[in-house]
């Protein structure tokens, strides 16, 4: 089995960003995507300013793809509502459109893209993978970009976590004019829901909730949430969506501290930020770009150094996001948060800046930025 120089498992934003940067650097990159074509994903409809800048660096114009501009956050808890300006312009775009654009860009700059191929296991010692048909492929370096899904042989070590992972749900709602230019965040007991317009005018609804709240099933959970969040119920016209996409076992706050030689863990395989921070796509893009640049300059031997640096870099933003998530999980914390933001709305913008991992200094990257973020 002759290894390829760089093997990327996962065709989401992290994997595609790594493939683009590697191909640009003249590295023969093989990108493996388990999906045969366009598909939806539970997470990732919000593009922060740092994500938009990273996409421009990669040669992808989100607004040209139809992304809906977002300039304000509307935070809702029960009947209370606070509206805040975001520190920089953001946008809403479906993962179906975003992922296809990134994979197309990777192919255009010279990466080899294999779609519709499911990887069943990995051998970290050999930096190799095994497909579901038994075929094997090895790389000089292996970039693990499987998102929230585990890969046998390289599964994340979550055994020491004190908190059970969360669950994520996604549905599509009819759009409405009151969502123009806004992302809504509806807070409720042990969870929250984000709502924004995407490119086709529909509204993307993403929920994060403590897994134990799903014990009675999705229908029972949604009935409870609609009672707790009346304004969200109004957005849903009092009806439960006909279809939900779901993912379980989301370990918010998790970061990998070390890796095996030649293995780069990027995106959610390296660090998982609470989705209320709105930085997941930016982290995916930034980690993929940074890891690829490190490999291009230092080879497979640089993986362990890069991973340790990314772990350090993500500590504060992810820690702040976790404090916000846990604080908003209960009624006392939610009430305090709403009061603080009503009295001092500037705290919202500061929190948004402090939960950025990919921006060099909490929001420094703007539309003119042209270099991928390093891990330092």
Question: At which residue positions do the language-model features occur?
Answer:
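Glycine-rich FAD pyrophosphate-binding loop
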Residues: 9, 20-43
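FAD/FMN-dependent oxidoreductases across multiple families
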Residues: 213-294
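C-terminal helical "tail/cap" subdomain of flavin- and related membrane-associated enzymes
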Residues: 293-376
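Predominantly flavin-linked oxidoreductase catalytic cores and closely associated redox partners
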Residues: 105-235
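Beta1/beta-strand and adjacent pyrophosphate-binding region of the FAD-binding site
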Residues: 1-14
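A conserved beta-strand/loop capping segment in the N-terminal third of enzymes
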Residues: 52, 56-103, 124
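Redox-cofactor binding/interface segments in oxidoreductases and associated redox assembly factors
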Residues: 9, 144-145, 265
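Residue-level detector of alpha-helix initiation sites
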Residues: 12-13, 37-38, 282
């Amino acid at each position: 089995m002759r290894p390829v120089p760089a093997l990327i498992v996962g065709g989401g934003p992290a994997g595609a960003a790594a493939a683009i940067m590697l191909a640009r650097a003249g590295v023969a990159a093989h990108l493996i995507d388990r999906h045969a074509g366009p598909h939806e994903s539970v997470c990732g409809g919000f593009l922060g300013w740092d994500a938009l800048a990273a996409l421009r660096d990669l040669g992808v114009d989100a607004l040209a793809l139809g992304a809906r501009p977002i300039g304000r956050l509307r935070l809702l808890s029960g009947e209370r509502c606070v509206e805040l300006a975001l520190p920089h312009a953001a946008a809403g775009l479906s993962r179906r459109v975003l992922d296809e654009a990134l994979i197309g860009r990777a192919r255009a700059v010279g990466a080899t893209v294999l779609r519709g191929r499911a990887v069943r296991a990995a051998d970290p010692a050999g930096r190799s993978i095994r497909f579901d048909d038994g075929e094997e492929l090895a790389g000089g370096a292996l970039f693990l970009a499987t998102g929230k899904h585990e890969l046998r042989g390289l599964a994340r070590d979550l055994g020491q976590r004190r908190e059970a992972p969360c669950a994520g749900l996604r549905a599509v709602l009819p759009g409405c004019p009151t969502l123009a230019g806004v992302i809504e965040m509806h807070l409720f007991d042990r969870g929250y829901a984000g709502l924004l317009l995407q490119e086709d005018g529909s509204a993307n609804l993403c929920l994060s909730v403590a897994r134990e709240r799903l014990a009675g099933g999705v229908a029972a959970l949604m009935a409870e949430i609609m009672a707790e969040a009346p304004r969200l119920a109004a957005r849903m016209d009092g009806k439960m969506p006909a279809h939900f996409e779901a993912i379980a076992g989301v370990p918010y706050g998790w970061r990998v501290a070390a890796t095996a030689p030649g293995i780069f863990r990027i995106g959610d395989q390296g660090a998982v930020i609470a989705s209320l921070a709105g930085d997941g796509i930016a982290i995916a893009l930034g980690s993929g770009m940074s890891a690829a640049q490190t490999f291009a300059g230092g080879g497979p031997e640089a993986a362990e150094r890069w991973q340790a640096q990314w772990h350090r870099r993500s500590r504060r933003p992810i820690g702040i996001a976790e404090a916000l998530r846990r604080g908003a999980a209960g009624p006392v914390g939610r009430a305090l948060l709403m009061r603080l933001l009503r009295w001092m709305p500037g705290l919202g913008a500061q929190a948004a800046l402090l939960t950025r991992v990919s921006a060099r200094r909490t929001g420094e990257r703007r539309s003119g930025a042209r270099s991928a973020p390093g891990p330092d």
